[in-house]
Amino acid sequence: VLRRAELLKAGGIDFIMNCEIGRDISFAELREKHEAILIATGVYKAREIKIPGVGLDGVVPALDFLTASNRKSLGDDVAEFDSGALNAENKDVVVIGGGDTAMDCVRTAVRQNAKSVTCLYRRDKANMPGSQREVQNAEEEGVNFQWLSAPHALLGDGSVRSVRERRIHPVS
Protein backbone atom coordinates (compact mmCIF):
# COMPACT_ATOMS: atom_id res chain seq x y z
CA VAL A 1 0.00 0.00 0.00
CA LEU A 2 2.78 2.42 0.90
CA ARG A 3 4.61 1.69 -2.37
CA ARG A 4 1.43 2.38 -4.36
CA ALA A 5 0.80 5.58 -2.42
CA GLU A 6 4.34 6.73 -3.26
CA LEU A 7 3.78 5.96 -6.96
CA LEU A 8 0.58 7.99 -6.91
CA LYS A 9 2.26 10.88 -5.08
CA ALA A 10 5.08 10.84 -7.65
CA GLY A 11 2.40 11.12 -10.32
CA GLY A 12 1.06 14.33 -8.78
CA ILE A 13 -1.70 13.03 -6.50
CA ASP A 14 -2.10 14.86 -3.17
CA PHE A 15 -3.45 12.86 -0.23
CA ILE A 16 -5.17 14.72 2.60
CA MET A 17 -5.50 12.36 5.54
CA ASN A 18 -7.83 12.53 8.54
CA CYS A 19 -9.96 15.18 6.90
CA GLU A 20 -13.74 15.03 6.86
CA ILE A 21 -15.66 16.96 4.22
CA GLY A 22 -18.26 19.07 6.00
CA ARG A 23 -16.31 19.14 9.25
CA ASP A 24 -12.71 20.07 8.38
CA ILE A 25 -13.36 21.59 4.97
CA SER A 26 -16.53 22.39 3.08
CA PHE A 27 -17.35 20.98 -0.32
CA ALA A 28 -17.59 24.58 -1.58
CA GLU A 29 -13.98 25.19 -0.47
CA LEU A 30 -12.86 22.10 -2.36
CA ARG A 31 -14.64 23.29 -5.49
CA GLU A 32 -12.94 26.69 -5.22
CA LYS A 33 -9.47 25.13 -4.93
CA HIS A 34 -9.73 22.46 -7.64
CA GLU A 35 -10.82 22.12 -11.25
CA ALA A 36 -12.07 18.59 -10.67
CA ILE A 37 -12.95 16.50 -7.63
CA LEU A 38 -13.18 12.73 -7.57
CA ILE A 39 -15.00 11.12 -4.68
CA ALA A 40 -14.31 7.40 -4.85
CA THR A 41 -15.72 5.60 -1.85
CA GLY A 42 -15.33 2.19 -3.48
CA VAL A 43 -17.35 -0.96 -3.16
CA TYR A 44 -16.60 -2.84 0.00
CA LYS A 45 -18.64 -5.99 -0.51
CA ALA A 46 -19.34 -8.05 -3.61
CA ARG A 47 -22.96 -8.70 -4.53
CA GLU A 48 -23.91 -12.30 -3.99
CA ILE A 49 -25.45 -14.25 -6.81
CA LYS A 50 -27.88 -16.90 -5.63
CA ILE A 51 -27.91 -19.67 -8.21
CA PRO A 52 -26.83 -23.31 -8.16
CA GLY A 53 -23.11 -23.81 -8.72
CA VAL A 54 -21.95 -20.48 -7.37
CA GLY A 55 -19.43 -22.26 -5.11
CA LEU A 56 -17.63 -24.05 -7.96
CA ASP A 57 -13.95 -23.35 -8.60
CA GLY A 58 -13.54 -20.71 -11.27
CA VAL A 59 -16.40 -18.52 -10.04
CA VAL A 60 -14.63 -15.30 -9.11
CA PRO A 61 -15.94 -12.06 -7.57
CA ALA A 62 -15.35 -9.12 -9.90
CA LEU A 63 -13.36 -7.08 -7.41
CA ASP A 64 -10.98 -9.98 -6.67
CA PHE A 65 -10.34 -10.36 -10.41
CA LEU A 66 -9.80 -6.64 -11.00
CA THR A 67 -7.67 -6.16 -7.89
CA ALA A 68 -5.38 -9.05 -8.86
CA SER A 69 -5.01 -7.67 -12.37
CA ASN A 70 -4.21 -4.18 -11.09
CA ARG A 71 -1.72 -5.48 -8.53
CA LYS A 72 0.02 -7.58 -11.18
CA SER A 73 0.25 -4.57 -13.52
CA LEU A 74 1.93 -2.62 -10.71
CA GLY A 75 4.58 -5.33 -10.40
CA ASP A 76 3.28 -7.12 -7.32
CA ASP A 77 3.64 -10.86 -6.89
CA VAL A 78 0.09 -12.20 -7.08
CA ALA A 79 0.01 -15.96 -6.55
CA GLU A 80 -3.67 -16.26 -7.53
CA PHE A 81 -2.95 -14.49 -10.82
CA ASP A 82 0.16 -16.56 -11.56
CA SER A 83 -1.67 -19.81 -10.79
CA GLY A 84 -4.42 -18.87 -13.24
CA ALA A 85 -7.14 -18.59 -10.60
CA LEU A 86 -7.50 -14.83 -11.20
CA ASN A 87 -6.13 -14.67 -14.74
CA ALA A 88 -8.37 -14.95 -17.83
CA GLU A 89 -5.66 -16.01 -20.29
CA ASN A 90 -6.86 -18.79 -22.65
CA LYS A 91 -10.17 -19.12 -20.80
CA ASP A 92 -13.78 -18.78 -21.89
CA VAL A 93 -14.95 -15.98 -19.61
CA VAL A 94 -18.55 -15.11 -18.71
CA VAL A 95 -19.20 -11.87 -16.83
CA ILE A 96 -22.59 -11.38 -15.20
CA GLY A 97 -23.85 -7.81 -14.99
CA GLY A 98 -24.15 -4.61 -16.95
CA GLY A 99 -22.57 -1.90 -14.83
CA ASP A 100 -19.18 -0.27 -15.00
CA THR A 101 -17.55 -3.01 -12.93
CA ALA A 102 -18.78 -5.60 -15.42
CA MET A 103 -17.36 -3.50 -18.27
CA ASP A 104 -14.03 -3.30 -16.44
CA CYS A 105 -14.07 -7.09 -16.11
CA VAL A 106 -14.86 -7.86 -19.75
CA ARG A 107 -12.24 -5.45 -21.04
CA THR A 108 -9.64 -6.71 -18.56
CA ALA A 109 -10.35 -10.30 -19.66
CA VAL A 110 -9.81 -9.26 -23.28
CA ARG A 111 -6.48 -7.61 -22.38
CA GLN A 112 -5.46 -10.81 -20.58
CA ASN A 113 -6.02 -12.75 -23.83
CA ALA A 114 -9.10 -14.69 -22.82
CA LYS A 115 -10.18 -17.24 -25.42
CA SER A 116 -13.67 -15.70 -25.44
CA VAL A 117 -15.54 -13.14 -23.36
CA THR A 118 -19.32 -13.07 -22.97
CA CYS A 119 -21.35 -10.66 -20.87
CA LEU A 120 -24.81 -11.69 -19.62
CA TYR A 121 -27.11 -8.84 -18.74
CA ARG A 122 -30.75 -8.98 -17.71
CA ARG A 123 -31.85 -5.84 -19.53
CA ASP A 124 -31.45 -4.65 -23.10
CA LYS A 125 -28.55 -2.54 -24.30
CA ALA A 126 -30.46 0.74 -24.02
CA ASN A 127 -31.25 0.11 -20.34
CA MET A 128 -27.93 -1.02 -18.97
CA PRO A 129 -26.32 1.19 -16.33
CA GLY A 130 -22.75 0.88 -17.63
CA SER A 131 -21.16 3.42 -19.94
CA GLN A 132 -22.38 3.03 -23.53
CA ARG A 133 -18.92 4.04 -24.72
CA GLU A 134 -17.41 1.16 -22.72
CA VAL A 135 -19.96 -1.22 -24.25
CA GLN A 136 -19.07 -0.03 -27.74
CA ASN A 137 -15.35 -0.41 -27.01
CA ALA A 138 -15.92 -3.89 -25.59
CA GLU A 139 -17.95 -4.91 -28.66
CA GLU A 140 -15.16 -3.64 -30.92
CA GLU A 141 -12.70 -5.73 -28.89
CA GLY A 142 -14.79 -8.86 -29.51
CA VAL A 143 -16.89 -9.16 -26.36
CA ASN A 144 -20.17 -10.99 -27.00
CA PHE A 145 -23.14 -9.44 -25.18
CA GLN A 146 -26.17 -11.57 -24.35
CA TRP A 147 -28.86 -8.98 -23.69
CA LEU A 148 -32.02 -9.94 -21.79
CA SER A 149 -30.21 -12.92 -20.26
CA ALA A 150 -29.59 -13.99 -16.70
CA PRO A 151 -27.68 -16.94 -15.25
CA HIS A 152 -29.88 -19.80 -14.12
CA ALA A 153 -27.15 -22.20 -12.97
CA LEU A 154 -23.40 -22.72 -13.12
CA LEU A 155 -22.55 -26.26 -14.17
CA GLY A 156 -19.46 -28.37 -13.62
CA ASP A 157 -17.86 -31.11 -11.58
CA GLY A 158 -15.71 -29.22 -9.08
CA SER A 159 -14.94 -26.42 -11.53
CA VAL A 160 -17.41 -24.37 -13.52
CA ARG A 161 -17.60 -25.58 -17.13
CA SER A 162 -20.72 -23.87 -18.43
CA VAL A 163 -23.45 -21.39 -17.62
CA ARG A 164 -27.12 -22.19 -18.08
CA GLU A 165 -28.87 -18.94 -18.84
CA ARG A 166 -32.48 -17.96 -19.03
CA ARG A 167 -33.86 -15.50 -21.51
CA ILE A 168 -35.86 -12.60 -20.16
CA HIS A 169 -38.88 -11.51 -22.13
CA PRO A 170 -39.77 -7.88 -21.48
CA VAL A 171 -43.41 -7.00 -20.97
CA SER A 172 -44.64 -4.33 -23.38
Regions found by a protein language model. Name each.
Residues G55, G99, A150:
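A generic "binding-loop/recognition-motif" signal
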Residues L2-E48, V60, D64, N70-S83, ...:
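A Rossmann-like FAD-binding core segment of flavoenzymes
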Residues G75-A114:
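Rossmann-like NAD(P)H-binding beta-loop-alpha module
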Residues V1-L2, M103:
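Short, well-ordered alpha-helical scaffold segments within catalytic/effector domains
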Residues R47, G58, A102-D104:
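Basic, gly/Ser/Thr/Pro-rich low-complexity segments located predominantly at protein N termini
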Residues E35, D57, K91:
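Conserved acidic residues
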